[in-house]
Amino acid sequence: MEHNQEHAGHEYFSQLYGATSAEGEPQQTIFDKWRDKMLVNAFRKYSDHNLATSDVLDVGCGYGWLLDAFEGAKSLCGVDIAHHAVEVAANRKPNRFFKQGDLHDPSPFAQKFDLILAINIIEHLSNPVAGIESIKNAAKPGAIVLVHMPTISNWLTKWEYSKLYDSDPTHIYRPSGKTVRKLFEANGFETLRDSYLPHFPAFLTKIWPIHPAYLAVFKRGN
């Protein structure tokens, strides 16, 4: 991957998360916490499995905060290309499983998962097809994959993207939400739901997207 993300450190993640504690440490924003709750609700709505019996993988896990929202799952695993992020996540939650890895490559975990979280990660891939194939290979038949990322669908979202996301040089893949959906469907996934911020009602947000943030719920075929 470009921009030496493997060696991204404290400064990069401080900018990435957009909020810091009183001690100057990166932390989640209120919006991120709201989004995480929405992701949990999406899993409960669309999955055939209970959270307590589900194996969960977060690709591009960063410091592992998203997995906090899925506490109570059978297993919680995270993978990130940045050694720093994996170290912080493992120290923060030693009862979980974190490994360093690149989404362009096969999953470093031998097991398969009932839920895979790909939150703000696809836009960092120089080869998104390889990333989606890696996700598919890590997913059990019938698994749910939740995808969230910035996209460009029209002149308005292109302008918003330039104001909200251009500052991150690691955003190298800038598709429309429709393109992302087609890539997943071409790799054997069924689209159960997709929308743009504010995400409700979903069908209205797709008629004319007013924000780059795209959320999709995919299901791996059997």
Where are these regions (language model features)?
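Short proline/glycine-enriched turn/loop segments at secondary-structure junctions
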Residues: 183, 202-208
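Short N-terminal helix/helix-N-cap motif within the alpha/beta-hydrolase-1
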Residues: 68, 126-130, 157
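A structural helix-start
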Residues: 83, 125-126, 149, 153
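A short glycine-rich, Lys/Arg-flanked "PGG" loop and its adjoining helix->strand segment in the class I
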Residues: 129-144
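Short, glycine-/aromatic-enriched active-site segment of Class I SAM-dependent methyltransferases
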Residues: 150-171
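A short SAM/SAH-binding and catalytic strip from SAM-dependent methyltransferases
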Residues: 115-126
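Conserved N-terminal segment of class I S-adenosyl-L-methionine
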Residues: 1-111, 119, 132, 173, ...
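Short alpha-helix
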Residues: 172-188
